Each structure stands twice: as structure tokens, then as C-alpha cells.
A protein has these predicted regions:
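Flexible coil/turn and secondary-structure edge motifs
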Residues: 1-152
Length: 152
């Protein structure tokens, strides 16, 4: 699901979040079966799916609401995230410093309905065409085994 997390404003709307004053980041909630995929793999996908060295920016979008942030629900998840960042840093995967925030998830707020399934419902949107599709196509090449057969 698309939504917002990491800020102070209760029940934020998209128009509040894009001001950058709520403290929330645009986020997704991932519901998964740990018997099928583990949290560590999801973290690998997270880091492979965006540029974690960009401060307050993803694609053409700028502002604190577009920051790279990984949320955890327990100390084990926190350690997995921190260990992965350490591994990427040690291996010099990126030429710049990783700026991803690692924060406890206090509350996830669902975004408005028109933000859900955005790619499917807006296939000709310029962000979808210029940012999302290229990321997905790269992922299909690098990690095809992680895609559901009925998706994309």
C-alpha cells in the first residue's frame, strides 16, 4: 500500500505531506510471508530499487517527504538494515555516502485511494514512464526470481 510514515502529523493528506512540514515521508507498506521471502531480502530489494545516497530526493522529486528511510518494527529488523548499510558501505557499492534513515515505525498512514495501485491506474504518467518503469525493468533483469508470476 502507498502511504506516509515517519512524521508527527496524525492522518496526513497528500497535500499536507508535500509541503514538507509534516515530517512524513512517502512510503509503501509491504505485507509479506516470511516463509516465502525474508526481511533481509526485502531490504536488499529496497536498496537496489532506489538511490540511497540522494538526500531528500528520489527521481525528479525533491523534499524531505522523498527521503530514503527504512522503517523497522523490532531490534532484529533494525540490525538487518544497519548490517546491510554497513555491507554496502564496506563494499563501496555507491560512490557517495548512504543517507538512508533507519527509524522505528510508529504509525503508517494509508495514502488516498488515487495513490493506490498508481502504476496500474496511471500507465502513461510521466513519473511512471521515466522513473518507475525503468526501475522495474532493471529489477526484472537483476532479480527475476523475486517477481510474482502474475505481476508485471
Amino acid at each position: 500500500y502507498s502511504g506516509y510514515a515517519g512524521g508527527k502529523t496524525k492522518n496526513p493528506t497528500y497535500y499536507q505531506v508535500i509541503t514538507g512540514k509534516t515530517g512524513h515521508a512517502e512510503t509503501v507498506e509491504v505485507i509479506y510471508d516470511p516463509e516465502v521471502i525474508d526481511f533481509a531480502t526485502l531490504i536488499e530489494v529496497f536498496f537496489d530499487s532506489h538511490d540511497p545516497t540522494l538526500l531528500n530526493q528520489q527521481g525528479p522529486d525533491r523534499g524531505t517527504q522523498y527521503r530514503s528511510v527504512a522503517f523497522y518494527q523490532n531490534e532484529s529488523e533494525k540490525k538487518i538494515i544497519e548490517d546491510h548499510i554497513s555491507k554496502l558501505t564496506k563494499e563501496k557499492t555507491y560512490s557517495k555516502k548512504i543517507v538512508t534513515e533507519v527509524k522505528p515505525l510508529s504509525k503508517f498512514y494509508y495514502a488516498e485511494n488515487y495513490h493506490q495501485d498508481y502504476e496500474k491506474n496511471n500507465p502513461n504518467d510521466l513519473y511512471i514512464l521515466n522513473v518507475s518503469k525503468p526501475r522495474l525493468n532493471k529489477f526484472k533483469v537483476t532479480s527475476p526470481e523475486l517477481l510474482k508470476k502474475e505481476q508485471h
